[in-house]
């Protein structure tokens, strides 16, 4: 089953591959066929599998951003040798120049065909379809339920521009209680050159994979003994997290926000009032009973900020109120979709809520956009893709308020000068929103920041303020997250930098490498001076040869290695080696400390000794 029925796609139970950026295709009529090529290639693969493995049953097989896959129920696990055999058979099918034809049949005819093939999964899929039922045939013998589209003939598929990449586990309909299937991933392109470029990008994505870097650089781990999706921050990662949080707090204070701290749990009645139990229960952890009351871990911070607002009488003179919180939330994620830091069960949301007057919407949104740009650009994210989602068919709230809110979002984006796309009807039922994606160093787009107006919670909690005329009015409530999940942003950032973090953010900024034991005392004194100046410095005391010390430091991606021999100790200096700028020469302690302090204060990527001379000079 393929095409529009992709909502049936089951979740992956095995290790999720590192995402890669799609190869950018030329804007030609030929490139528009790429999805058809991938869709058709998935059918070719399914046909090949069923020829080589007659007991294999097909389920669904859509295209993806970088290729295609198909889920199979097969008695035996597919091996690497099987993938090679399947690929070879696919080449034969392509070479036969078979037509792919669309056929409309009645439900009864589709059921008859499926039963003749003994395909129970197709019968279950058929139950959800409405007539007319469409099939796609591949040659005269193979077919599948499918809405299309496809290429007209396998001769349009390039046998040198596809590859079968991996096998992973998947649950039928994404339900862990249902059958375990095998998902074969493939990729398909128009040309062999595009396939080669895809492979190169995939290798680069694997090199940058935050899960590997997190282990290699000793930043974080996820321990099975504690549970899936729960992050352990190691000292190096924790130091980086603290730096990120400190900058976030500083930016918010300077942006006119006050900070909140709220509980991790709440009485179940709060989640009933907020609507989470009606609309979000499957993503919440179950209740726990304390003193004959039931509590649940919070999946979101919003209701807590609402209660804080409602804790006292508010006047229009107080608005806008801007509150922000680095609040830890807990959400149930299925085992198959968790992925390093990108998808976890406990994470920190950088939530903020603005309570304002209707006429303040545009100014407040612009303020949020400016703060978003400031924070993201500090981590070298400057290319954005922005979507504005408007009122859906089913929505709450007055039409006039929706119109005013949407107009405010548009006006703010125009004042900011940011290009955006409109997703008509794509907003939540409780308000329009802006979604912002960031582009990383290898061209991948990541959903990050969200600005969401909410007409729901103020109504549910009966929030109000005293207007100028003495009447009670509902405030406008704006949800806002810049990082989204701090853990996820950390993973994205790690991959963007490939672990080569800028100087100000590196957990270990300078490593001192004493060449002999005789200069160890000088190195210790130097380290103490660096630490006293707020610079994160260490000493390699292993006594290994200098070449090995340098290799170890480079492997750990230390921004600056400071070699200390007898000559440097005598001069009160060190010979500096920068990851980003190479050999910096022999620099005195005083100049190094002053330059490093300046780099930290200005959040610079590397040390700069421009317009100055080294000791040797």
Curated annotation (Swiss-Prot):
Residue span of region Catalytic: 209-502
Q: What cofactor does this protein call for?
A: Zn(2+)
* Record's keyword terms, sorted: Aminoacyl-tRNA synthetase, ATP-binding, Cytoplasm, Ligase, Metal-binding, Nucleotide-binding, Protein biosynthesis, RNA-binding, tRNA-binding, Zinc
Q: What's the top EC group for this one? A: ligase
EC number(s) reported in the record:
6.1.1.3
Please name the SMART domains in this protein's record.
tRNA_SAD (SM00863)
Main localization category = cytoplasm
Listed binding positions for Zn(2+) are 302, 353, 479
The protein's superkingdom reads Bacteria
InterPro entries, alphabetically?
aa-tRNA-synt_IIb (IPR002314), aa-tRNA-synth_II (IPR006195), aa-tRNA-synth_II/BPL/LPL (IPR045864), Anticodon-bd (IPR004154), Anticodon-bd_dom_sf (IPR036621), Thr-tRNA-ligase_IIa (IPR002320), Thr/Ala-tRNA-synth_IIc_edit (IPR018163), ThrRS_anticodon (IPR047246)
Annotated signal sequence range: none
Q: Which reaction does it catalyse?
A: tRNA(Thr) + L-threonine + ATP = L-threonyl-tRNA(Thr) + AMP + diphosphate + H(+)
Q: Which Pfam families match?
A: HGTP_anticodon, tRNA-synt_2b, tRNA_SAD
An annotated GO cellular component of this protein is: cytoplasm
Q: Which CDD domains match?
A: ThrRS_anticodon, ThrRS_core
Explain how, and how many, cofactor molecules are bound.
Answer: Binds 1 zinc ion per subunit.
What Gene Ontology terms describe what this protein does at the molecular function level?
ATP binding; metal ion binding; threonine-tRNA ligase activity; tRNA binding
What biological processes does GO assign it?
A: threonyl-tRNA aminoacylation
Subcellular localization, as worded in the UniProt entry: Cytoplasm
Question: What Gene3D superfamilies does UniProt report for this protein, alphabetically?
Answer: 3.30.54.20, Anticodon-binding domain, Bira Bifunctional Protein, Domain 2, Threonyl-trna Synthetase, Chain A, domain 2
What do we know about how this protein assembles, alone or with others?
A: Homodimer.
Q: Which family does this protein fall into?
A: Belongs to the class-II aminoacyl-tRNA synthetase family.
Function, in words = Catalyzes the attachment of threonine to tRNA(Thr) in a two-step reaction: L-threonine is first activated by ATP to form Thr-AMP and then transferred to the acceptor end of tRNA(Thr). Also edits incorrectly charged L-seryl-tRNA(Thr).
In Swiss-Prot or TrEMBL terms, this protein is called: Threonine--tRNA ligase
